[in-house]
């Protein structure tokens, strides 16, 4: 009888307990194979609505729908064992009412097996977050630069450059914490404000374009691997995936056209 070692997934409660402890490692993932590779090293795998821009070529995250998020969420859950899988609620799936948010969030959890959902917004989303949390759905908040509000912001612009905006962003963070979120993403905000919020909140802050003093960091995996020409200021590239892919495909094409592939060892012979 074989014995399989069961790996326990990290929970949202465990992430919340990491406040002020060892920094939380998070990356986006959209496919089973990337989830499998990242899982041993990540505390959180975020199935972000950024999938729309990275995988589908949309200019924003707005065209992404619930079915797409569920499909990619299922793949990431299947491909991982340890990390907490958090799935973005896409634009239009939660803003109408707290009841709409619950129906769609519960569908995400039930159909994917993920551990939490993430939704964007500040004070105006507090009632919805509270409603979800009280009904057993762990929620990660997201403030600062919220990509689903790109049209309101007039682009992907850094938040908090004017100190007059600090109180509004701070109010957003505090209200989300009080509503029951287990963690909060701080995206595209000036570093002093990110540090202030991290010190003020009792839940972990996950930075992306914020500060290394946040309780954790998240990046789009393809950005840090070196895929794509555009490199945001806050991204550090740890590889050159695009160049590696191009070189491999070029070599393959050359081998096919020269009939060097397949070789003798790569074809089947009669016995």
Curated annotation (Swiss-Prot):
The active site is at 187 (proton acceptor). Its cofactor is Mg(2+). One of its GO terms (cellular component) is cytoplasm. It catalyses: 3-methyl-2-oxobutanoate + (6R)-5,10-methylene-5,6,7,8-tetrahydrofolate + H2O = 2-dehydropantoate + (6S)-5,6,7,8-tetrahydrofolate. Catalyzes the reversible reaction in which hydroxymethyl group from 5,10-methylenetetrahydrofolate is transferred onto alpha-ketoisovalerate to form ketopantoate. Homodecamer; pentamer of dimers. This is 3-methyl-2-oxobutanoate hydroxymethyltransferase.
């Amino acid at each position: 009888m074989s014995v399989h070692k069961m790996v326990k997934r990290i929970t949202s409660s465990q992430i919340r307990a990491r406040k002020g402890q060892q920094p939380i490692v998070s990356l986006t993932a959209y496919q089973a194979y990337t989830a499998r590779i990242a899982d041993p090293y990540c505390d959180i795998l975020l199935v972000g609505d950024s999938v729309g821009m990275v995988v589908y070529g949309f200019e924003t995250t707005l065209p992404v729908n619930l079915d797409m998020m569920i499909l990619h969420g299922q793949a990431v859950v299947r491909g991982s064992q340890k990390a907490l899988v958090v799935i973005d609620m896409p634009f239009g799936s939660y803003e109408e009412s707290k009841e709409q948010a619950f129906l769609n969030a519960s569908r995400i959890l039930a159909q994917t097996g993920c551990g939490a959902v993430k939704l964007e917004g500040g004070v105006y989303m507090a009632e919805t977050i509270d409603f979800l949390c009280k009904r057993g759905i762990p929620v990660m908040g997201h403030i600062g630069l919220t990509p689903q509000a790109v049209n309101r912001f007039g682009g992907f612009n850094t938040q908090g450059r004017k100190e007059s905006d600090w109180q509004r962003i701070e109010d957003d963070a505090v209200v989300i914490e009080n509503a029951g979120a287990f963690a909060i993403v701080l995206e595209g905000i000036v570093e002093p404000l990110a540090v202030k919020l991290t010190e003020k909140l009792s839940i972990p802050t996950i930075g992306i374009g914020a500060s290394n003093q946040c309780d954790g960091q998240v990046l789009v995996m393809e950005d840090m691997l070196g895929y794509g020409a555009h490199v945001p200021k806050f991204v550090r590239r740890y590889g050159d995936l695009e160049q590696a892919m191009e070189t491999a495909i070029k070599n393959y094409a050359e081998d096919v056209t020269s009939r060097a592939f397949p070789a003798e060892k790569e074809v089947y012979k009669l016995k």
